[in-house]
Amino acid sequence: MSKESRIFIEISENIIDLNYWYKIVSDDSSGATSSFLGTTRNEFKGKSVERLEYETYEPMAIKEIEKICKTILNGFENDIKKIGIVHRIGNVPVGESSILIVISSGHRKSSLEAVHYAIDTIKSTVPIWKKEFYTDGSENQWKGNCESCHFNNNNHPH
């Protein structure tokens, strides 16, 4: 199985189907499947959030996510089985998910560490922007990726 046949990436306006993505990375040789599901929360810095809107330059976003996946496969060559990453674009209401990362591996440590690496690196390198829409109609702002997440160990909110 080539590395490319172990990587599954999608940018989509559709609601993320967890079961579909878990099936994609399912592998008889894996003993663990780890995931991260990013969800739109209802507040940010005390302001009530209605929804998020995501935009991207899709070819570049996919290329950057592929690089991240290949780095993961090279770093855990004998243990990572498959990687699935889907990121939504367009409107994502409160309670719905904007990103899912699912990674299968022979052992739990590898997939847990790989998921952590993937989300931090996606947020710091992939050209995806979000705009928060507040319930009070106050000014909405476009926000880029959190540049310091991957390089700074501070525990700050996204």
Swiss-Prot record:
Which residues are listed for substrate binding in this entry?
H107, R108, K123, K130, K131, E132
InterPro entries given in the database record: MoaE_sf, MOCS2B_euk, Mopterin_biosynth_MoaE
Q: Where in the cell is it found?
A: Cytoplasm
For the protein in the UniProt heading, the enzyme class is transferase
GO BP = Mo-molybdopterin cofactor biosynthetic process
A Pfam family found in this protein is: MoaE
What Enzyme Commission number(s) does the record list for this chain?
A: 2.8.1.12
The record lists the catalysed reaction(s) as: 2 [molybdopterin-synthase sulfur-carrier protein]-C-terminal-Gly-aminoethanethioate + cyclic pyranopterin phosphate + H2O = molybdopterin + 2 [molybdopterin-synthase sulfur-carrier protein]-C-terminal Gly-Gly + 2 H(+)
Primary location recorded for the protein, binned into one broad class: cytoplasm
Q: Does the keyword Cell division apply?
A: no
* One annotated GO molecular function: molybdopterin synthase activity
| Gene Ontology terms: cellular component | cytosol; molybdopterin synthase complex
Associated pathway: Cofactor biosynthesis; molybdopterin biosynthesis
UniProt keyword terms in alphabetical order: Cytoplasm, Molybdenum cofactor biosynthesis, Transferase
Q: How does it assemble?
A: Heterotetramer; composed of 2 small (mocs2s) and 2 large (mocs2l) subunits.
Q: What does this protein do?
A: Catalytic subunit of the molybdopterin synthase complex, a complex that catalyzes the conversion of precursor Z into molybdopterin. Acts by mediating the incorporation of 2 sulfur atoms from thiocarboxylated mocs2s into precursor Z to generate a dithiolene group.
Q: Which family does it belong to?
A: Belongs to the MoaE family. MOCS2B subfamily.
User: Could you tell me what this protein is called?
Assistant: Molybdopterin synthase catalytic subunit
Encoding gene (name): mocs2l
